[in-house]
Amino acid sequence: MFRAQSFLPVLALVLRVAAHGYVDQVTIGGQVYTGYQPYQDPYESPVPQRIERAIPGNGPVEDLTLLDIQCNGSGGSGTKPAALIASAAAGDEIAFHWTTWPSSHVGPVITYMGKVPSNTDITSYSPTGSDVIWFKIDEAGYENGKWAATDIMSAQNSTWTVTIPKALAPGQYIVRHEIIALHQAETYPGAQFYPDCFQVQVTGPGTETPTSQALVSFPGGYTPTTPGITFNVYSGSITSYPIPGPPVWTSNEAFSGGSSSSAAASSTAVASSTADSSSSAAATQSSSAAPSSSAIGTSTASSAAASGTAIVDANTCMNSA
């Protein structure tokens, strides 16, 4: 005889999985990479190599004091470096495609980058909570009655696009992209953080490294009293939202060192060839649409040879999906 009680835990799990999200695909400099698949990759043999650091699932981080707030994770230990690294030039776009995102999970979309220290390889580097390396390159919150994480991103096919600052010096960087869901953020803890981290080798003629005023650590970049961490989205009189964290950095000259603004979405709509994630993935997996290996610059290739890092093109990642 079927027992309703035995079905309830399964139903609860299904609802939990359906109610959250993560980045399942990223387009960097026009090349498409499969993100880490938390419900598939750990069970593959061999485990697929990715440019994204592993995440435990699609659930949130809620404790701002844990290392998990940095790049996701569970139990406070954070996450481990990925095996691969993508290549991009300063000024290139990065488009993050999210799995289905619930309309109730309103909030900001924020992207940071963190430079890997000299003489350190990104595939073996895990920032500590005291490493002040993270600078914000993009943010969007609430404007004209629209939330970035729901209204705006939904109109962009669940995709958010940012630009690597043109002034940025070459090197290895961790790109930290997150949504902060505010549907339970009236008190702390309550806000839900969904960070995903990707490994990128930046090339180009840029010469600038953000000054200390632009940098934060994770944990540390947000606290329970940081504006925007507690926020009542049901007040009925919202006109603006204070986005947590430092101001956006595009260059040291442009960086003002002031407080973060609740700017309109600074992302751009993804081109139709990449906005439709399913068609992009299919095109990338086909041999006829495989990206050219010439997309990896000479300087990047020589850097990879020196460090032993596996610089990959999109075809490598997509074929391991």
From Swiss-Prot:
Pfam families: AA9. One of its GO terms (biological process) is cellulose catabolic process. One of its GO terms (molecular function) is metal ion binding. GO terms for cellular component: plasma membrane; side of membrane. InterPro entries: AA9, AA9_LPMO. Binds 1 copper ion per subunit. Residues 1-21 form the signal peptide. Its EC number is 1.14.99.56. O2 binds at H183, Q192. Cu(2+) binds at H20, H105, Y194. Disulfide bonds join C71-C197. It is a lipid-anchor; GPI-anchor. Lignocellulose is the most abundant polymeric composite on Earth and is a recalcitrant but promising renewable substrate for industrial biotechnology applications. Together with cellobiose dehydrogenases (CDHs) an enzymatic system capable of oxidative cellulose cleavage is formed, which increases the efficiency of cellulases and put LPMOs at focus of biofuel research. It catalyses: [(1->4)-beta-D-glucosyl]n+m + reduced acceptor + O2 = 4-dehydro-beta-D-glucosyl-[(1->4)-beta-D-glucosyl]n-1 + [(1->4)-beta-D-glucosyl]m + acceptor + H2O. It is an enzyme of class 1 (oxidoreductase). Residues 294-321 form a propeptide. It is found in: Cell membrane. Its main location: membrane. Belongs to the polysaccharide monooxygenase AA9 family. Lytic polysaccharide monooxygenase (LPMO) that depolymerizes crystalline and amorphous polysaccharides via the oxidation of scissile alpha- or beta-(1-4)-glycosidic bonds, yielding C1 or C4 oxidation products. Catalysis by LPMOs requires the reduction of the active-site copper from Cu(II) to Cu(I) by a reducing agent and H(2)O(2) or O(2) as a cosubstrate. Has broad specificity, cleaving at any position along the beta-glucan backbone of xyloglucan, regardless of substitutions. Shows minor activity on glucomannan. PANTHER family: ENDOGLUCANASE IV, PUTATIVE (AFU_ORTHOLOGUE AFUA_1G12560)-RELATED. This is AA9 family lytic polysaccharide monooxygenase A.
